[in-house]
Each structure stands twice: as structure tokens, then as C-alpha cells.
Amino acid sequence: MKITGETASAVFESIRQQILSGALTPGQLLPPVRDLALALGINRNTVASAYKRLDAAGLAQTQGRRGTVVSARPTPGAQEGTQAGSGLHDLASGNPDPRCLPELRALLPARPPRLYGTPTIDPVLATLAHQQLAGDCPAGYALELAHGAVDAIERVLACWSVAGDPVAVENPCFLGSLNTLRAAGYEALAVAIDGEGMQVEALEQALAAGARAVLLTPRAHNPTGASISRRRARALRQVLERYPQVLVLVDDHFALLSRRPYHAVIPPTTRRWALLRSLSKSLGPDLRLALIGCDAETAARLRLRMAPGTGWVSHLLQDAAAAALGSARVAARMKRAGDDYVARRELLRQALQDEGIVVEAEMDGLNLWLPLGRDSQPLVMALAQRGWQVRGGEVFSVHTPVHGLRITTATLTATDARRFARDLREALAA
């Protein structure tokens, strides 16, 4: 490799160009700071500064005594949804039932065009959003919007984190969150979960290991369906109280449909925090809108970051969300939808139990999670041969493989539940 430069910026740019051109490849070790400084005739601090910039840009990664290596290029991970045209019965997509979603176009009110300089958050939506957030956010919170939960996670993390920063996440973890961490170059620290949410000792270990942020799901964890209990929330708060500098993100994506109570995990000592509530499951994934309640400094950084890009979330989307959230008819429809999702998941749980397959009853969300003691892929393939498409649990894993099946039950009928349960029993026995 031919690295040149007399300043930190010049050394950074020289290495950057070689990485982009392919002359330096992922995993390749960069020269030790001392050696490169001697070769270039410059101060070691200059080289160290250049390497630090490469790390922050996600181009290289400092690995302690091993030195600094060129980072692997991020690749797209598994995505929610399934490909159109598949002949398989879709129990893998993670989608809500389209029949449970309101017809937003019919709700849209006639509004005058919004122009530059219009307040970025519509006051009608703001009032309705505060009704959704006020009781669950710490006092003095600020309201912001994003283009869905994953966009909110990406934006809030970017307010306070740089590539290489450790972020504590549940294992297994929601696909959108995993992809966000990979794309931004954050280091995911796996935190084991159980039926009551993040395990306290596992979170403590991640924080002691240097986690700069914690991302967790209070209800309807995807893929397991777990919800944080009151007892667990209290224990998690006690741990987080000792780390006031750590950013806490709470992804309450299923809030409007959940049948589980919300138990707050953000302690009063936490300085940087955000509670995210997406409208995708309740009003439709294409709405691309999430409500964010957060501390004032995070809100200011979100606005600063939004301003030179999209500027604001479209007022057409805000109008649709406000019309739906303010409609008694839509509220009743969401109530029926939430009840329906519980009933459909219970149909499958009972059908599996009838076939001798015991599944945890305390779940929430659009899916049923079936833990396995082995790699799920042979079972996924066996079910595909019988006409079913499900998600193998390994795609949700953070470092340590998690074996299981995520089965989307949002549109499942009683007949299909019984057929699937029989086919699953046969596949397990094969």
C-alpha cells in the first residue's frame, strides 16, 4: 500500500481513496501508527488522528492490540415482508392484516397547501400525539416526528453516536434495528431476553462493557412477542440509573394495538432518551410516520439533522395520521384489530398444543415465536415443501445464534392454523 500525506486530513484522504478504489480490502491491516509515522516523517499523533477519523467514518476499525483494519462494507440484511409471486402460504412477512387497516384516503381532510416556513409539526397532530405520549414520557419531553420506527431509531442514534460505538440490543433483535446498526457501523452488544423482556444481568454486562446506547422493546418484541413486566421494568430502571450518560431508546412499535400495559424503563437520571411509537402496524406500513417523545437536546439535534435533508415529515402524511388518530371510528377499528390479532395467535397456539407442541402463551404482536433447540433452516425448508413460508430465527440473531421460528399469525384462519400445526408436527418428527 502507498499511503501519503503530511497532515491528518491528507493521510485520512490517502487511505480513504485506496479503500474506495479497492486497493485496500476489508480485513486488511493498516500499518501500525508508529511505523507509518516514521515512514512519512510525521508525528505519531497525526497518524493516530487520521486513524480515528477513519474509524469514525466507518472505513476502518481499531481493534486494540491487533491494530486498525479496513472495515467490511455493510451489506443489506434480511428485510421484513416477502417477495410477491411466491406460491407458498405466507406466514413470514410480519405484516398486519390489510383488512384491519383504515382507508386513509377517505379520511383526508381538505387543507390548504403548506409552504416553506410552516411549522414542521401540524398542531392538530401534535395534540393527538401528546395524548399518545404524555403519560409515558418523563416530564418536560419534546415531540418530534420521523418516517417510521426504523428511521426514528437511525436518526436518534446518529444524534449521539458514531461508527464503532457499542449499542446494547435484544438478542434476538428486530430486523430493521439490526440492519440500521450494521449500515451505520455501530457495534451491537447482544442482551439476552426472556418472557419479561431484557434480562437485567445481561443488560448490566453490556453497560459495563461500554455500551453507549440501549435499544429495547417494551411490548410485542419482534420476533418473540415478549413484553416487559412491571417487575422487570423496575429492575431495568435501577440498572440504567447508574449509567445516566447512556442513550436509552424505547421502540414501542405496537403501542396502539397492544393488549399489554406499558411499563416505563427510562429513569429520571437518564439525560438522553427517546420513546418511539410507530403508526405502521395500526394505520399501515406505507404511512411512514412515527411519533418521538424525547429530551430537549435530542429533539434539537433531530431538527438540526432533518433540516438540510427532507426538512420535515410531509404534512399530507401528518394530515392522514391526524385524521385517523382523531377518528372514533378508526379507534374502534384499531380496538377490533388488536383483539383479532390476539385471537388469531391464540388459534395457532391452541392448534399447536393439540398436536403436542407447547408454546408460551404470554405473547403480543403479529407473530407467534416457537423456540427450537437446533438450527431452524431444515425445518423452514421442510415446511416450504409442505406449502408454508416462515422465518427462521437465526436472521434475528446478534452474534450468538438464536434458534426458532417466527410465524406471522395476523391473517391466519382456524382451518389454516390446524393444517399448519399438523404439518409442523410431521416436519419436527421427520
PLM segments and residue spans:
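Amphipathic, non-transmembrane alpha-helical secondary structure
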Residues: 12, 16, 154, 158, ...
